[in-house]
Curated annotation (Swiss-Prot):
It comes from Helicobacter hepaticus (strain ATCC 51449 / 3B1). GO terms for biological process: cell division; regulation of division septum assembly. Signal peptide: none annotated. Belongs to the MinE family. This is Cell division topological specificity factor. Keywords: Cell cycle, Cell division. HAMAP family: MinE. SUPFAM superfamilies: Cell division protein MinE topological specificity domain. The gene is minE. Prevents the cell division inhibition by proteins MinC and MinD at internal division sites while permitting inhibition at polar sites. This ensures cell division at the proper site by restricting the formation of a division septum at the midpoint of the long axis of the cell. It holds the Pfam family MinE.
Amino acid sequence: MSLLGMFGHSSQKSATLARERLKLVLSHERTANIPYLEDMQKEILQVVQKYTRSSKIEFSTNSNQNINTLEVEITLGN
């Protein structure tokens, strides 16, 4: 393997990682412009806590083109 080949593979991997990070930042910025998002998350959290003994609740937001999604992952306790 040539010296350039070794560095080319690393920069390709680095470029992919940078692209994924940029997608994450852009997604966060797009969903940050939704004024009711924080209130919605608080209300969902209150309802889940009312009906379950959840040990873990995680919110994540995604944005693809012009579609924003809010994902909620709830780990239920015994």
